[in-house]
């Protein structure tokens, strides 16, 4: 028989007592009552906060949104196939946060800031809360610096400033995303960080955008946040806030940032789905009562910061898709009232061959005028009015058989101005080129050029200036002002190109 040694037993007991962990961990735990359609009802979680992250037994994360008397309504940020009735749920005590930092540049991430581009994890230790307060009144400064889009029609007539919120609105397939991508491409030498948020889009469309940006070297200063159509509604709802959070990091570091939300109609639809499943009372068009706040708190985070705050800026270009041009629907009117102007794209203009298909008559920039460069502001002052008058006359002239000479001339000039503003995709123009093109049209220097040759004239003028009048481009790009000397150089160049074209046409 094995002899029992008391000293050995006492040594084991002493060691176990010494190793005993006295710390007590208290966790707020609940039980799943029902789960389905991306929503879980949880019993317990007495101390849960609104918007708190909760963790399910299978590792799925959720957000507590409805705090009711006897249960908590949570949205799932994942498929949640492993969640069953009776599963335990743990409150994390944290609000949703995403990783931020320089390492995010050039990456494609999901709504939680996790890499989905197959390039491994993002090497950053910094995080920011997804829901952050917008800068206050004292922390802001009025918009005064231009944000060049590279699209002549916008920079000349509907200018956007750094820190502005400018809505891009139009039916499907009217070139809304194309304007946003062109704007990103034009920031290559502007020292601006871009964030492109894709909400509820086809994965193939997002892959196409990534490829375009990579080919043209724009991915180096861009972060892409993607919540595709296949993702749960909660992730589609969160994506724009994630994009704003990533841009905010750079804004508070004193950098200029640009955020594109493509598009907020799909985010509103995802929020409506979540709210209806959580049994919140529906309002107009079945959207919940706080859908306005959902967008206003997002877009108010865009700002031009004061000197004391580091002079950073966040420019927001939200995109809204309309149905059959109806800008008076609920979500479009909401976002129009929040933003500082809108660029309206018309499917009729798009189908008639005018691209970008901007309807100048109802497009407006409420604060961008203060940020426009003097060179183009001086020249383009009458451009918007002339185009609006041309549209009216064009409609009237369909019914009038004989028109007087001045009306005929106005119609002819309007046609040429229209042609001048045509611009192919992925070919943003520098300021000097825009100034030259607008000057030629507004001053009537191309009235002798046939309408079908105006696009060729625009291209040839740009090439002529680059090769023969480089001093004009240098002066406009550096000084941003049109001096009498520069105007004389430009006039000579336009006359030269026009005479060459007219001679070759004859």
From Swiss-Prot:
Class of this enzyme: translocase
Localization of this protein:
Cellular thylakoid membrane
InterPro entries in the cross-refs: ATP_synth_asu-like_sf, ATP_synth_asu_C, ATP_synth_asu_C_sf, ATP_synth_F1_a_nt-bd_dom, ATP_synth_F1_asu, ATPase_a/bsu_AS, ATPase_F1/V1/A1_a/bsu_N, ATPase_F1/V1/A1_a/bsu_N_sf
EC number(s) on file: 7.1.2.2
Q: Gene3D superfamilies recorded for this chain?
A: 2.40.30.20, ATP synthase alpha/beta chain, C-terminal domain, P-loop containing nucleotide triphosphate hydrolases
Pfam families linked to this entry: ATP-synt_ab (PF00006), ATP-synt_ab_C (PF00306), ATP-synt_ab_N (PF02874)
Q: Which UniProt keywords apply?
A: ATP synthesis, ATP-binding, CF(1), Hydrogen ion transport, Ion transport, Membrane, Nucleotide-binding, Thylakoid, Translocase, Transport
User: Which HAMAP family does this chain map to?
Assistant: ATP_synth_alpha_bact
Q: What is this protein called?
A: ATP synthase subunit alpha
Q: Which organism is it from?
A: Synechococcus sp. (strain CC9605)
Tell me the name of the encoding gene. Answer: atpA
